[in-house]
């Protein structure tokens, strides 16, 4: 049996990102997965911190991480680590021809399947929400 430096379980967006980062660091990576992962059913959006503990929408996820409870998972790793991870993700996806738009420091509003909007950090370029801000009416067909 061949040995690996890193074993990743799951081939969703998080698993594939972890595999890319480890491989770029020179590690021999093996991915264990059953089926196609969540990429077949998910939109590929990257949420970071959309709402505060009190349910208020977050405009700047990095700033909100700095203000979060020390027990919050993002606070434990710190905003700069989250920022670096998101910048690495943006770099990898752009270099692979699947660019994302957005900023680690500013959430954008994305329409949901039930007709409302939710804050999210990064979205594939094919899901650019800027045109929605200028629209007077939005028609959803489905």
Tell me the role of every PLM-derived stretch.
Residues 1-6, 24-25, 37, 53-55, ...:
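Extreme N-terminal leader/targeting segments of oxidoreductases
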């Amino acid at each position: 049996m061949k040995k690996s430096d890193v074993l990743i379980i799951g081939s969703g967006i998080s698993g594939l990102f972890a595999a890319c980062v480890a491989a770029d660091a020179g590690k021999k990576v093996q991915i264990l997965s059953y089926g196609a992962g969540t990429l077949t059913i998910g939109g590929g959006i990257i949420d970071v911190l959309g709402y505060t503990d009190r349910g208020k929408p977050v405009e700047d996820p990095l700033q909100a991480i700095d203000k979060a409870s020390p027990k919050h998972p993002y606070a434990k790793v710190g905003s700069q680590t989250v920022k670096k991870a998101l910048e690495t993700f943006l770099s990898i996806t752009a270099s692979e021809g699947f660019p994302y738009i957005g900023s680690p420091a500013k959430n954008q509003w994305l329409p949901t399947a039930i007709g409302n909007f939710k804050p999210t950090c990064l979205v594939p370029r094919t899901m650019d929400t800027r045109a929605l801000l200028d629209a007077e009416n939005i028609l959803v067909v489905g």
